[in-house]
Regions:
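Bacterial N-terminal signal peptides
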Residues: 8-17
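Short nucleic-acid-contacting surface segments enriched for D/E, G, S/T with interspersed K/R
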Residues: 79-94
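Short aromatic-glycine-enriched beta-strand elements
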Residues: 48-58
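OB-fold/S1-family single-stranded nucleic acid-binding modules
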Residues: 100-123
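Conserved hydrophobic positions within beta-strands
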Residues: 39-42
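Bacterial N-terminal signal peptides that target proteins for export
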Residues: 1-8
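Short boundary/loop segments of OB/S1/cold-shock single-stranded nucleic-acid-binding domains
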Residues: 21-35
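Short, basic/aromatic beta-hairpin or loop at an interaction surface
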Residues: 62-74
Length: 134
């Protein structure tokens, strides 16, 4: 019985590993493609865990398109210089996006340039060597 509890705990942790890894997969985003939206208008900024979200309206030749952009969690956002009020509805921003592979109007926000020229990473801070922080 003394061995059963620790072995059960280990088995449970190992069984959940796949679910945790699946949640953190970026496979839905095409990191080989980059879109740059020069004049995006912020519709909504969701300062929440497990991921912050940026909803923007992007002007196109056929009219505005709404995009939903995923960002990292709040810990990474804070380390990258974000605050809950860094952007608000109506703000004009430039945003660099890795779009979703399925062609929907969604993606991963990589770089966000605010109206004052300040650039913030949507995927967390960068190490001194230029590599993304883990």
């Amino acid at each position: 019985m003394k061995r059963l509890v620790p072995l059960s705990a280990i088995a449970a942790v190992l069984a959940m590993g796949g679910a945790a890894a699946a949640h953190h997969s970026g496979a839905m985003f095409d990191d080989k493609k980059t879109l740059v939206f020069e004049n995006a208008t912020v519709k909504e900024f969701q300062w929440s865990n497990p991921h912050a979200w940026l909803e923007v309206s992007v002007p196109t030749a056929t009219g505005p398109q709404d995009w939903s952009l995923e960002m990292v969690g709040l810990g990474g956002m804070r380390r990258a210089g974000w605050k809950f009020n860094s952007v608000k509805p109506g703000d004009k921003i430039k945003v660099t996006v890795n779009p979703t592979r399925d062609g929907s109007h969604g993606g991963r926000a990589d770089l966000v340039t605010l109206a004052d020229g300040k650039v913030l990473r949507g995927q967390g801070p960068v190490r001194p060597n230029g590599a993304p922080a883990e």
